């Protein structure tokens, strides 16, 4: 599951290709509203020589939350310190990070929704008043110590906004929601990446990669690197649509960006369960995949593409899903997504 080339989760190779990341806000492609607003807030903070208000980046994985956080620090001309929610296991870990920050530095916490409640409690006064309240000692001899902190900017990133506690969420003065990218935006990202990597690419080659990238820059960059590998070995001088399509077919990434696992999921419901409805536990058992992987990794993109419906009775495939995988609609299924006729004579009776 973690080896999917179209998966949006971070992989080691994604971290190695840092040269593909934009370094300044003007080079960042997509998320126009977020970029424009951030540019205003950054300029205002610079003009006043103040720390930027705390920022929360929310959205699906792979859309550029970490990259944007690094750009914000670079545009502000301050240091950038990065960590993640699961790494900060106790209050002392957070205190060590905060006390080492210089004035107006940026502290980036990825997966901030995974902070423990004890660490969150320490974070509240640090965010609001730039003060750290720590308990020193145990039992009757315990005492509270208040530490003054340099003004700083906390940038949090989360893929699960609903898991953030209300007190923590409300302390971010600049909430930014990132959305999936349009194909045209991803084409720009692919062209820029090809230029950085020194790869010759035609416009239709960039389009072929972009339209299969599932609206996610991280996936686009990964597909670009793999297509480059095929082109290099096969002696292709310039990657056009034909070369890109050939490479992506060998990677089992189809024209919608679906991979072999997506096709297994769709065929499981279409063939084994006549298009549904079928429960997620049954699907998980049939595919030998954990339920959370089905719900959080496989299904979101299929639902976004209008191929799957989640209903109270279970998962159903839409007619578009049957058409995409080349399986005929079961008898009795209507043309409406996720609906079935109760009786064969429904249409004749005007109750389809």
Curated annotation (Swiss-Prot):
It catalyses: ATP + H2O = ADP + phosphate + H(+). ATP binds at residues 20-21, 62, 65-67, 128-130, 171, 181, 218. DNA binds at residues 291, 310, 315. Keywords: ATP-binding, Cytoplasm, DNA damage, DNA recombination, DNA repair, DNA-binding, Hydrolase, Nucleotide-binding. One of its GO terms (molecular function) is four-way junction helicase activity. Residues 1-181 are annotated as: Large ATPase domain (RuvB-L). Homohexamer. Forms an RuvA(8)-RuvB(12)-Holliday junction (HJ) complex. HJ DNA is sandwiched between 2 RuvA tetramers; dsDNA enters through RuvA and exits via RuvB. An RuvB hexamer assembles on each DNA strand where it exits the tetramer. Each RuvB hexamer is contacted by two RuvA subunits (via domain III) on 2 adjacent RuvB subunits; this complex drives branch migration. In the full resolvosome a probable DNA-RuvA(4)-RuvB(12)-RuvC(2) complex forms which resolves the HJ. PANTHER family: HOLLIDAY JUNCTION BRANCH MIGRATION COMPLEX SUBUNIT RUVB, PTHR42848. This is Holliday junction branch migration complex subunit RuvB. It comes from Parvibaculum lavamentivorans (strain DS-1 / DSM 13023 / NCIMB 13966). The gene is ruvB.
